[in-house]
Amino acid sequence: MSKIKTNRSSSRLAAVQALYQYAFGEKTIDEIAREFMAGDIGREVIDEDEQAGTETFVPVMPAEPTLFAGILSSYAQNADQINEMINASFAEDWSADRVELTLKAILQAGTAELMAYPETPVAIIITEYIDIAKSFYS
């Protein structure tokens, strides 16, 4: 996984990680958010070196609490609408249920942020989540 550049980037990554964890249904969004903000989870990412076959834990910058909470709050308040929008974007014979959970969490967090922060340029938000996706899938 590539290095996270800013606290805002860390906030977005933490939101993706939180929504990924939420998908398992074991904790509420509020419980997960508290664990992230307390530093109990989400302070490191795994940097994989496929050629060497090694994994290293790399610390990330702390999340910016306002953005992190805003994304999660937006998702909690608009989950049905967000998931409907994501499902509607797939071909007729596909649904978000067929999408890997990490990708689904990236789409959910990005959509939640777009809804919560209309003043933030769309290109910035999309670029940030593309970078997050690349860090997981490249």
Language-model region placement:
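N-terminal interaction/assembly modules
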Residues: 1-138
